[in-house]
């Protein structure tokens, strides 16, 4: 019996007001896929994630997450935002942040001994067991990212969505982030957004290119010509090493300015 797609978009369109961001989008993400969503600023990347999470509703078309509507399957998806802010005057431990993935959508709530045990195990899973009692606001960018990934994992999701996990860490720490993502169970579907093509090529197997429409390609087929055909001159692929091909993204300043805010 063929398993249902982890995520299925069928002729999905969405816009903010009069501006259409996504137009008749069709694609499937299979269970266990490791994919990245790329595209120019304003192209619809974050909008795509919000539609998967059920935070936005499409203007037309249908979205299914493991065969059900996104609203019914929110517990099956773990979400890692770009950043999470707390008032430094009000102390919040790393363990408290992870527990949010167990006690519901509110910031705080009752947690059982089993919840705390699972939260500690999730921190250990991402290699940060020693941070449980540390104040979240005092952690480095990479440590915060690890804690947020642990928060997403503690609910035992079937898929995990990461919105630009490499955006707020030093370039030298990206290898550490890739190692962190390798801690994720192989049966979990991984969907991440990134602007850094070097990180994309070394981390995922399939790329979803978004610019109103959606094009899906294996990472190995991602070329400069293909990117330019999809996005114009905003992204450029650079091969650094024939033995270990990588890539970098370069944004045309005027193109970024023309795109306006990021969606």
Model-predicted segments: where are they?
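Conserved ABC ATPase "signature" region
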Residues: 99, 113-131
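ABC ATPase nucleotide-binding domains
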Residues: 223-263
